[in-house]
């Protein structure tokens, strides 16, 4: 492979990523590589699917700079959210789910009493959700996604949020 492709890739090795992105040959190579290695999960339109992020929006858990994207492609990303169902129990999981929904859903789409109880759980032990998701749910780069927008890797329904809190998530 090195004999066959080494000369082609050498052209881009020391070129700034911004220049590589504008190069027509690099664009063709990139499209071929995306179609070979990425399309299965992220889709032909790169808009993702359940469990696989949309690559066309501005919501990047690991950062959206060219260098951060390069690192993600080169090294991959493994993210784990611990399951909180056993520690919290069903009712407190529902409280936290309603609090999370209060960040991005209009009143009436979540239970305000449960959300008020969920606030205390989100910001305190044992869960301390804010350490990964930020004090106001805005997310912490590389730790936990933004919960205040309408971008949900695993779907933003109450059922899906409860499932995520209860069972955790393992993204690779």
Residue ranges with predicted function:
Residues 58-66, 83-93, 126-128, 146-163:
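Electron-transfer interface patches adjacent to heme c in soluble/periplasmic c-type cytochromes
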């Amino acid at each position: 492979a090195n004999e066959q492709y080494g000369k082609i890739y050498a052209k881009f090795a020391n070129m700034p990523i911004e220049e590589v992105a504008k190069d027509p040959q690099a664009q063709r190579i990139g499209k071929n590589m995306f179609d070979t290695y990425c399309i299965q999960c992220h889709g032909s339109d790169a808009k993702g699917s359940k469990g696989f992020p949309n690559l066309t929006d501005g919501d990047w858990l690991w950062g959206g700079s060219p260098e951060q994207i390069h690192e993600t492609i080169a090294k991959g990303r493994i993210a784990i959210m611990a399951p909180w169902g056993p520690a919290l129990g069903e009712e407190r999981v529902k409280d936290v789910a309603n609090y999370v929904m209060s960040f991005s859903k209009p009143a009436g789409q979540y239970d305000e009493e449960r959300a008020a109880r969920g606030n205390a759980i989100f910001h305190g032990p044992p869960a301390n959700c804010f350490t990964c998701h930020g004090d106001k749910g805005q997310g912490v780069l590389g730790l936990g996604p933004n919960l205040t927008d309408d971008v949900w890797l695993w779907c933003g329904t109450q059922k899906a949020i409860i499932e995520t809190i209860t069972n955790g998530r393992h993204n690779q």
